[in-house]
Each structure stands twice: as structure tokens, then as C-alpha cells.
């Protein structure tokens, strides 16, 4: 409940020191100063009586949070302080707004970008997310400044920053050619990354599974990562192979971090394919060993056993070189077509389905949405075709040449999801975007990733405790990107805050019915303004563009 107009009911009993002082180096200590010098101020808002979790991973404490303008200006007992508005948080948790370090809020095509089509970002706000970082998987806008200016001109409901994509940079210089760059081309790509970092990118992302990034060798990525490192950026990667080549791909990521001298992050960390189930233990051990050797290596994940991407991921890399006409000619050539089909069968068997064609579900075929929601098995049955991997490969090729589709792939094991989640070097990210209900059948992570962690993995299963989960969704990603004034509840930090019911917060989106908003988040403030009030979306869009060049402090 929110009450306003009680400007005389509080008299300030705090000062500069009445707050939680966060120890950045330790990342997990918080303290209060109980006898500060007095300093009078009137607050715009006080969040009163909630269990406050500062984002460090420390236990919560019943405190009040005072806000003036866009900043937190006091934390403590503010029961006598003057304020224009009181937000009653008794019985609720008060936490930093969550930061999605892997977001598809903006896509390369503006017309399909949720942030521009649905700038209020309701599906994020209802999970407690106040900041999204775009440009993942090697794909971003270029120039970066063009994107950030466009976002600034679109009042948005959440904060937004971006990485610069390796695939984007490579395509700018080399198109979709499957070869190594010349010295001049490599220099041009390095220059593009340098410019993007100067324009505010937070680092370099790669998608070495996708075209044209898959055509790059490790040395190329190291060279571009050095340009990001020069501006205190990070390297975040969709691994070259998340299936049978998982461990070698993590070794490559570590080598990039070592060679370029920058922090690295394995994004949407998973072990994909039945033959790889359980391999997360070895994957995490590789990251632990890297950290022990002084290489800063972390990961993020979404809390599901299914992934989602375009069906072109089923094709051999070599078959996707060049423009659409070149790819179509390749598929029309009998010899090359046979090789392509064999490659699709191998990928379906070894990584994406085993021999179970219900594991692949079509999410969006924009050219024929009657196909949305069908499994590959169901697709074959619709056309009265044999339910075999070979028939499925033929249909996949037909889907791609007809216009392409995105799909959901049920390829992971719950044991790996939980093991990766527990690891202290793992933070939470959605790999989702901004949606409103529509004809697509997207991955439920778009609507539920962060709420699912709290509802399922904290409350129901006990995989994480509540303070640790909050840390993995707020301060941990903030620190990863050098944001010393977001992702935490501290005096001087921006007032990006979620107030939620820890006993009710839960995801409602399912794979069968994904367009369902999460529940249990009561209030959300973005830069001190109410974006969600008493569970209802406001018309206020107080989100801001975040640039790495505006960081107050570098990464700890």
C-alpha cells in the first residue's frame, strides 16, 4: 500500500552515515552507522518497514529506504523523517532492481525489437527487472551510438545498455565469408570495436556458433577483445559448441581471457544433449581453475532445461556462408543438399533431440504461424511423413528455405541447471526479450526467468537461499560491468528497486502457454520513479540509456 501527503509525520533522524556501507572488495559485507551526524532532508519517497536485502548476499534487515530524486539517500530507521510519500513494505522484501546481463530487448531489426514496440517493458517490470543489457551472442546494432540515441528518443520503462557484437563487426567488414581476415580487415574490425567502446558499449559479445562468427579463429577474437579490454570492457560469449564440444569451447573462452587480458563470461551456461548431461561439473571445474590462475571467468544462466534459437543452428556452418541466394543455390545442388541433410541429422541426433523429435518445438514461423507450437514430430505427422530423423531433416530444410523459424529445444538436464546455478561464479540472465501476448509461442524465459528463480529454485526447491539469489540477479551483474551505483541498495546508488512478496513471487509462463506475466512483484521503482505500483503498471517511463563511459568506478 502507498500513502502520500504525510510530509510532517517524519522528522529526520539520520545523516550521511545512516546507511549500509558496502565493501566492494569483499562484495558481501554491509554495516550500519548508528550514531551519525544529523543532516535534515525531506524525502520524495520512503519505502518503509520492509526486509531490505542490499544485493551483496547478506541477510536482510527490517529498515526504511529513503529516496530523493533518482537516488537512495538514506537507509535506516526513518520513522520520524519528512517525506512526500510512504510505500508500506511491511511483510515484503525490498531488493535492488534486477539486471539482465543477456537481453534481446533490442534486436538488429528495429521492427522486431521489443524495446521499441513495447517500451514500457511490462514483462520485465513484473519480474523486478529494471536494467537490460543488449547486444548478446555476437549481434548488436552498429554504430552503437545510433542505437543508444534511438533508445534515448524512445521513453523506456527500464534502463538499457549494450555490448558490441563480434558477428556484427565481422559482417560489417567481411560479410558472411568463411575465411580468415586480412591484416587490413582485422585492423578495421579492431577499430570498429574501439569506436563502439568509446560510444559506451560494455564489452564485446560473441556468438561463435552463429554465422559469421563461427568462421573466426581464436586469435581473431583475442585481437578484438583486446580493443574491449583497453576500455575496461568484458568478453561475453555464446560458446562455439554447447554440446559435445562444450569443454573445448570453455577452454577457448579462457584462452581469450588470458590472451586479451580481460574478464570473460560464458553466457547461458549449459550442457546440451543427452550425451553431455552431467558435464557441467567438468565445465565449472575449468572455470574454477582459470580463476585460480588469475583469469577472471564467470557465467550466467537461465533457469530452464530448454533453449531457444533459430532453426538455422541445425545446419552445418559451411552451408550458411554467403547471402540468401548463395545459400539457396547450395541447398538446390544435389550433392551439397545431401551433405547438408546429413549434417542436420547429426545435429538432431547428437545435440538437439537424441531420437526424440518432440524435443524441438517451433516457436515462431512468421510466414505461416499455423506451424507455431508444433513439435518436429507433430510437423511430420501433419504432412503424413515418417517420424524419422531423416524426414525431420528434410522438413527443417523446407522450413529454412520457406522463411525460417525460431524453435525451443528441450536438451538439458535439471541436475546441470541446478549445479551451474549453485556455483558462486554464476549469475542469472534471461536470454529473453520484451514481449506482449501475440501469435508467437516463445520461450517462457521472456516472462518468467527471474521470478522462476525466486519461486521455484529458492522457495520450492531450496537450490539457493533468498539473499544469494538476489545477489546473483542484482549486484553480481552490476559489478561485472563496473556499475558501482546500480544493482545495490546503498546510499548514493540509483533508486532501481523492487518490492516483492517472497512467499508469492512466481513465474506463470509455461512452454505451452508462455504469454503469462509473473506474479508477486508489488512495486518497482526505476531511477526513483514508480514504474509498477501495487501490482499495476504506471504510465511513467523513467528508464535511461546506460553507457560504459559514464561509469562512476571500474569493475572491482
Give, region by region, the residue ranges found by the protein language model:
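Divalent metal-binding pocket/active-site signature
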Residues: 195-253
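Bacterial N-terminal signal peptides
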Residues: 9-23
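Divalent-metal coordination cores built from histidine and acidic residues
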Residues: 89-94, 98-206, 225-226, 291, ...
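Divalent metal-coordination and catalytic microenvironments
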Residues: 50, 65, 70, 91, ...
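Active-site neighborhoods of metal-dependent hydrolases
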Residues: 163-164, 172-183, 187-211, 225, ...
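Histidine-rich, glycine-flanked metal-binding segment
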Residues: 38-46, 52-97
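Acidic, glycine-enriched loop/beta-strand segments at the rims
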Residues: 36-37, 52-64, 404-417, 461-470, ...
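C-terminal cap of metal-dependent C-N hydrolases
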Residues: 418-425, 430-431, 498-544
Amino acid at each position: 500500500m502507498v500513502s502520500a501527503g504525510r510530509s510532517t509525520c517524519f522528522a529526520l533522524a539520520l545523516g550521511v552515515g545512516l546507511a549500509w556501507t558496502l565493501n566492494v572488495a569483499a562484495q558481501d559485507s554491509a554495516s550500519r552507522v548508528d550514531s551519525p551526524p544529523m543532516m535534515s532532508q525531506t524525502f520524495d519517497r520512503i519505502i518503509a518497514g520492509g526486509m531490505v536485502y542490499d544485493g551483496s548476499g547478506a541477510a536482510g534487515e527490517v529498515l526504511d529506504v529513503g529516496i530523493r530524486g533518482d537516488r537512495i539517500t538514506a537507509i535506516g530507521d526513518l520513522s520520524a523523517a519528512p517525506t512526500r510519500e510512504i510505500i508500506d513494505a511491511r511483510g515484503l522484501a525490498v531488493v535492488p532492481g534486477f539486471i539482465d546481463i543477456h537481453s534481446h530487448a533490442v534486436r538488429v531489426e528495429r521492427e522486431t525489437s521489443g524495446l521499441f514496440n513495447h517500451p514500457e517493458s511490462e514483462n520485465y517490470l513484473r519480474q523486478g527487472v529494471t536494467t537490460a543489457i543488449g547486444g548478446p551472442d555476437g549481434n548488436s546494432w552498429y554504430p552503437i551510438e545510433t542505437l543508444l540515441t534511438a533508445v534515448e528518443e524512445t521513453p523506456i520503462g527500464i534502463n538499457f545498455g549494450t555490448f558490441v557484437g563480434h558477428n556484427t563487426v565481422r559482417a560489417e567488414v567481411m560479410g558472411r565469408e568463411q575465411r580468415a581476415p586480412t591484416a587490413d580487415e582485422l585492423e578495421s574490425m579492431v577499430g570498429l570495436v574501439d569506436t563502439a567502446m568509446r560510444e559506451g558499449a560494455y564489452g564485446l559479445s560473441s556468438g561463435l556458433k552463429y554465422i559469421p562468427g563461427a568462421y573466426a579463429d581464436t586469435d581473431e577474437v583475442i585481437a578484438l577483445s583486446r580493443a574491449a579490454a583497453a576500455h575496461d570492457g568484458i568478453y561475453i560469449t555464446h560458446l562455439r559448441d554447447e554440446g559435445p564440444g562444450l569443454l573445448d569451447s570453455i577452454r577457448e573462452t579462457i584462452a581469450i581471457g588470458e590472451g586479451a587480458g580481460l574478464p570473460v563470461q560464458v553466457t547461458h551456461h549449459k550442457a546440451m544433449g543427452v550425451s553431455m548431461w552431467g558435464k557441467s561439473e567438468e565445465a565449472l571445474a575449468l572455470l574454477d581453475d582459470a580463476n585460480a590462475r588469475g583469469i577472471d571467468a564467470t557465467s550466467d544462466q537461465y533457469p530452464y532445461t530448454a533453449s531457444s534459437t533459430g532453426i538455422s543452428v541445425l545446419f552445418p556452418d559451411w552451408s550458411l556462408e554467403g547471402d540468401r541466394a548463395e545459400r539457396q543455390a547450395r541447398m538446390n545442388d544435389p550433392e551439397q543438399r545431401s551433405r547438408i541433410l546429413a549434417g542436420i541429422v547429426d545435429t538432431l541426433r547428437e545435440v538437439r533431440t537424441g531420437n526424440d523429435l518432440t524435443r524441438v518445438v517451433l516457436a515462431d514461423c512468421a510466414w505461416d504461424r499455423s506451424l507455431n507450437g508444433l513439435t518436429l514430430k507433430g510437423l511430420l505427422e501433419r504432412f503424413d511423413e515418417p517420424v524419422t530423423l531423416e524426414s525431420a531433416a528434410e522438413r527443417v530444410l523446407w522450413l529454412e528455405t520457406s522463411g525460417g523459424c525460431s524453435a525451443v529445444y528441450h536438451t538439458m538436464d535439471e541436475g546441470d541447471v541446478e549445479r551451474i546455478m549453485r556455483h558462486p561464479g554464476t549469475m542469472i540472465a534471461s536470454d529473453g526479450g520484451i514481449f506482449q501476448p501475440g501469435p508467437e509461442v516463445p520461450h517462457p524465459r521472456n516472462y518468467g526467468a527471474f521470478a522462476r528463480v525466486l519461486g521455484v529454485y529458492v522457495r520450492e526447491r531450496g537450490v539457493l537461499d533468498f539473499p544469494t539469489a538476489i545477489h546473483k540477479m542484482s549486484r553480481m551483474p552490476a559489478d561485472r560491468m563496473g556499475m558501482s551505483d546500480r544493482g545495490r541498495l546503498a546510499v548514493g546508488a540509483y533508486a532501481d528497486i523492487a518490492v516483492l512478496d517472497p512467499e508469492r513471487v512466481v513465474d506463470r509462463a509455461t512452454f505451452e502457454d508462455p504469454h503469462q506475466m509473473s506474479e508477486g512483484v508489488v512495486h518497482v521503482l526505476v531511477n526513483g520513479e514508480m514504474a509498477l505500483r501495487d501490482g499495476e503498471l504506471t504510465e511513467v517511463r523513467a528508464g535511461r540509456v546506460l553507457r560504459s563511459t559514464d561509469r562512476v568506478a571500474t569493475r572491482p
